[in-house]
C-alpha cells in the first residue's frame, strides 16, 4: 500500500483516464462488475462524481494532479469518463486515495505511456485460486485495469483485483444488485448519483471545517449530502446536507451552530426524529469542494 501526498494523490489523472481501456484484457464472460463494488469500507469519506453532474470537476481532477495535461487534453479525457468513485483518508500532510473509475478510453495510448522511460514499473498479480493475471502499474500512483471499462487507482489494488476476479466469475444472470463492502444504504446512495455529486462522511469534522471555515464540534455520527450546480450561478453549488447526531441534545446545539455558520433560514431545515437534521439549498462556491478534494 502506498500513502500518497496531496498532489501525487488522486493521480497521474490523465494517464488513468487515457488508459481506462488501454491496459485491459477482455472482460471474462460472466456477471458484469460494477466499479463501486471494488471500493472497500476502510475510508472515512466517500464521493461519487458523475460526468453529468460537473464535467469541469473531472477536468480539474485531471489537470490538478497531472500538470502536464493541457486544458484540451483534460476536456477530451473527461468526456470519456462516466463516473468516478473515491474513498479518501486525509491527514495534515497527505491524502490516501482509493478510486474506481467507469469510462471508455482507446487502447492505443498504452505503449506510449506505461513504460519504463516514463517512470512506470509493471508487476503481475494473480488472485489466489485464479488463473487470471493482472498488470499493476507503479509510478506516481499505482493503477490497474481489470476490465475494459474499469480503472482502479491508489490504495489496496490487490484487494480490488481479488474482488473483481471473484465477482467477474459469477453467473451472468446473477441478480444481486451490488456485492459491496459498504453498508447497503451508503452504497445505494452513492450508486444513485447521476445528475448530482454525492458524498458520505464517516468522519465529517474536516469536511465541515473546510465548508464553514469554523471548527465545529457537533458530536456527529456521520454526514451525507449532495452537490448540484446552481442553475442561476454556474460557479456555485446548491448543497443539501443530512446530519446524524449522537443524540437529541447534540442535535439542538448543532442546529444553532450550523444556522450561524451557513446563515440559514428556518425554511431550509428539517428535523427527523430526535437525531437527524436535514439542511437544503446551501449555496457554496465550487472552489470549496475543489479545496476539499485538494484540486
Model-identified regions with their sequence ranges:
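Leucine-rich, highly hydrophobic segment in Treponema pallidum outer-membrane-associated proteins
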Residues: 190-295
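C-terminal motif of bacterial Sec signal peptides marking the signal peptidase cleavage site
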Residues: 21-23
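Short cationic amphipathic helices and targeting signals
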Residues: 47, 94-103, 149-154, 237-246, ...
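Short secondary-structure junctions
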Residues: 117-129, 264-271
